[in-house]
Every structure is written in C-alpha cells, then in structure tokens.
Amino acid sequence: MKIPLRLLCFSLGWQLLLAPLAPAAAPDPIRAVLAAQVAAWNRGDIDGFMQGYARSGKTTFVSGDKVTHGWQTVRDRYAKKYDSRAKMGRLTFSGLTITPLGADAAIVLGSWSLQRAGDQPHGKFTLLFRRLPEGWRIVLDHTS
C-alpha cells in the first residue's frame, strides 16, 4: 500500500510542477480592445484607436525599417500618415490568434486591411499586449 501511495504523491507532485503558474490571459478582453480600435478607426477617430495602446514612453511601433517609441510619437505618426477619412479607409482585422504568455501578457497575430477608393493596402501584425491597471493594452506593435 505504501508504494502506490508514494507513486500517487509523486505523480501529483509532477502535475503540480508542470501546471501553469498563473491563469492564462483571457482572449475576450483583448478581442474587445481590438474591436474598439477597429470601430474608432472606422469613425475616423485616431485618438479612440490609440486607446488600445499603453500610454507610455516605452510603447513601441515597428513598421518597415522604422521604429517609433512612445505613445504620443506613435499617435503623431498615425495622425500624419492618415490625415483624412479617405486615407483612413475602412479597417478590418482578421485571422486573429491570441497566445497567452501568462496572466498579464499575450501575443496577438493577425492580418489587417484597409478598404479605400483607390487601393486596398493590407498586411500582418504581431502585438504584445500587457494587462495594465487600465486594462489590456498594446505595448509593442510590429506591422508589415
């Protein structure tokens, strides 16, 4: 009887060691942030779109060969590049995959596309979300 009990204790111990240390990040709040960003963009509201980003000097946006640091700098970049409703077009996100990295972080992979009168630019993105006191926010955005 002692051997099976030891085996049971050993087995349970390993299961506890291999179990996640923290609950996984919930994808629903992250999806809600992304949906709010799309809705804001499609209203022509860059400031509303930017609410999805961490309001921090460390927030980072990477696109092409350019790296932009800081929430305000990222916001200014968007405002300059998309200075009219025509340039903003209609945004959609698709193919979203959310991978929790623990209780307070997640990676999101997805595709973006803009429907505009003259063209339909599109690409991929990788976002690092962190759970902050104000909720889930993007701290790193790599868009191509």
Label each residue range with its predicted role.
Residues 4, 11-52, 56, 73:
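Short, low-complexity N-terminal intrinsically disordered segments enriched in polar/charged residues
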Residues 48, 60, 106-107, 137:
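General beta-strand recognition
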Residues 52, 58-69, 83-87:
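A short gly/proline-enriched turn/hairpin at secondary-structure junctions
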Residues 53-54, 65, 97, 110-112, ...:
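A mature extracytoplasmic/lumenal domain signature
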Residues 55, 101-102, 132:
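Structural motif
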Residues 73-117:
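Surface-exposed, charged secondary-structure patches
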Residues 122-144:
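Short beta-strand edge/turn micro-motifs at domain boundaries
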